[in-house]
Amino acid sequence: MRSSSSPFFLSFNSGPGMVLKAFFPTCCASADSGLLVGRWVPEQSSAVVLAVVHFPFIPVQVKELLAQVQQASQVGVAVLGTWCHRRQEPEESLGHFLEGLGTLFSHEPWLQLCRERGSKSWNCKATRRQGPTPLAPACEDQVMLIFYDQRKVLLSRLHPPAALPERQAGDATASAGGLAAVFDTVARSEVLFQSDRFDEGPVRLTHWQSEGVEASILVELAKRAAGPVCLLLACLLSLVSAASACRVFRPWPLSFIWSKLSTCEQLRHRLDQLTLVVSAHRAEGPAQLMRKANTLVSVLLDMALGLLLLSWLHRKDRFAHLAEALVPVADRVAEELQHLLQWLMGAPAGLKMNRALDQVLGRFFLYHIHLWISYIHLMSPFIEHILWHLGLSACLGLTVALSILSDIISLLTFHIYCFYVYGARLYSLKIHGLSSLWRLFRGKKWNVLRQRVDSCSYDLDQLFIGTLLFTILIFLLPTTALYYLVFTLLRLLVVTVQGLVHLLVDLINSLPLYSLGLRLCRPYRLAAGVKFRVLEHEAGRPLRLLMQINPLPFSHVVRTYRLPSCGCHPKHSWGSLCRKLFFGELIYPWRQRGDKQD
Amino acid sequence: MEDERSLSDICGGRLALHRRYYSPSCLEFCLSCPRISLRSITAVTCTVWLAAYGLFTLCENSMILSAAIFITLLGLLGYLHFVKIDHETLLIIDSLGIQMTSSYASGKESTTFIEMGKVKDVIINEAIYMQKVIYYLCILLKDPVEPHGISQVVPIFQSAKPRLDCLIEVYRSCQEILAHQKAASTSP
């Protein structure tokens, strides 16, 4: 229906006023005379030239080739006009011959490009018949020449990707906006570029690959080897995931521990990613391919960094030093905590505490620390072996090593976490009690049914006991609040350190290194758009422009191709965090995805 | 054919408007901003180094001086590459689109191209900027969903900030080409 070879078809948008744009590949600018082959886009009044067919040719064979290409690529390839690259003296016979071709391959409008050899002056003419009969007078359109680098346009990908139409029979609807249609045409016509000048085909073409099809031995070998390697890796990974899902790890204490450790989370994430990469399905589209490549490069870099870390640790027997330093450090931390508690039990910062409560709380926490120190001393002979075995896991990747570090920090500061929970629970109990008794003091009550504060008439003895309790609680508030404040600050410190480690792990997990490398080395592959440059212009000659690819900025590359990660983001805003701190609710600022609310 | 005029921007600095007419359907306007002056570079460098020397006499640490030199160099390079715009160009090609290029002092160029199918109109708009009312030229983009709506307003010559006389000239030329484009696109 939209076949461009019908002489009765007139484009509705391109009247005589609209300038005709001819997209011409730079590789064909020095080719010999011949026919122009490409696609005509009537909505934008543009002709995308894909190749030049040289003399001598047999018209029937040219038509056959074009039909084959049209079948294979779903692009409406047709003969658009003639190309003449001649010497200084115009050859009259050639001129008539070229015009005669117009009747053979009828196309509206018929393009005639002409260039003098060795000079930069071009001549363009586009003729269009104004009636159904061949004898009707022809009218000429203004032509604008736009040069484009065929190889770069073929390989590049526009962002944001225009909604590419599905492959339909016949000419694809150019619902893609103006320039996206050009990119789309060149990308789909790859089958036209398969033959080079060393082939013995019936038709001689010039296009970007006509000097010889490019290929790399390494890439071809890698492609051949990739199949069996992927199969082997996929089997191994399925074995590992089956082993991890087996019954041994199901019972409750173990599954609870696995869910809390960030190392397991990271290992699971890596396993998922690797399974995706080595799966046997082909990537559906360019986005999937980029994601696979990014994942692979990220995993390889991770392992390389991990091995580097391992070799550095082994070099000067650093494991032994670390193990030796670990127990004194834990001891030191416990000692500092004891000093802190002694300070709180006295008169901290000149404040006067309630002596009895102070002593109770202080002794309680001191006993905990005593237990903790004994536990650490119990473990100290085994520390070096444990550390050595954990260090081996660094060969699985730097992210795993960092996750193990974060887990070790959690385990070593477990007593701070316990103290924080005790302090917070005590404080929140006190605050709730205080608020309820304060309402009683004013003669009001919380209505659970209506979720609001209502007035209530209390008995005298209720009021008496309530006021007494209120007074007791309010006088004990500073002591509890101080303990709560101190332990919350310690807990926040530990959480900040862990958060930084997790941030680093997240960064390594989600950075799209392959895309960034591509943007650095082959910027034309990721295109944000195009840019034009006006070439030397002489009066009376057609306007010549050079179309270049405008590469995507680095920030957009990261944003578009960012890999999905474990999602370690702070779940609360600052306002809700402050509110929770004030009321003594427990906070878990860094939540992994899939954690249940406590 | 080419045309060059000397104008001023909203703060009184000198601008040069360079107009190139390639063909009835292709026009280019180039606005050159005032160059970076040696006086301001010298003033900033002297201030930073004096402050560093003052710190050095307090702390007796020679790292401060090397750090000051490093910071000055990096700051200058960063300023030339990311902040200081040398000239801004507007290229209008009938039936193709509008292209805006900013060239930085270090030679970096950042280009944006808007296809003609997305351009609704080019207008001069007023804005209140601190205590002044300024005029700026902007491109209105069509909304793909609503035929009479505007999806985005793209200002042109944002760092050169020329005055109304320059804007009127650019506006007239743009409107000529856009009118031609509209006539061509609506004719049967």
Swiss-Prot record, chain B:
Pathway: Glycolipid biosynthesis; glycosylphosphatidylinositol-anchor biosynthesis
GO cellular component, one term: glycosylphosphatidylinositol-N-acetylglucosaminyltransferase (GPI-GnT) complex
One Pfam family from the record: PIG-H
Cellular compartment(s): Cytoplasm
Taxonomy of the source species: Eukaryota, Metazoa, Chordata, Craniata, Vertebrata
Biological-process GO terms, alphabetical: GPI anchor biosynthetic process
Family label: Belongs to the PIGH family.
InterPro entries cross-referenced by the UniProt entry: GPI-GlcNAc_Trfase_PIG-H_dom (IPR019328), PIG-H (IPR044215)
Assembly mode: Component of the glycosylphosphatidylinositol-N-acetylglucosaminyltransferase (GPI-GnT) complex composed at least by PIGA, PIGC, PIGH, PIGP, PIGQ, PIGY and DPM2. Interacts with PIGQ.
Functional summary from the UniProt entry: Part of the glycosylphosphatidylinositol-N-acetylglucosaminyltransferase (GPI-GnT) complex that catalyzes the transfer of N-acetylglucosamine from UDP-N-acetylglucosamine to phosphatidylinositol and participates in the first step of GPI biosynthesis.
Cytoplasm keyword on record: yes
Keywords: Cytoplasm
Primary subcellular site in the record, as a coarse category: cytoplasm
Protein name: Phosphatidylinositol N-acetylglucosaminyltransferase subunit H
Signal peptide positions (record): none
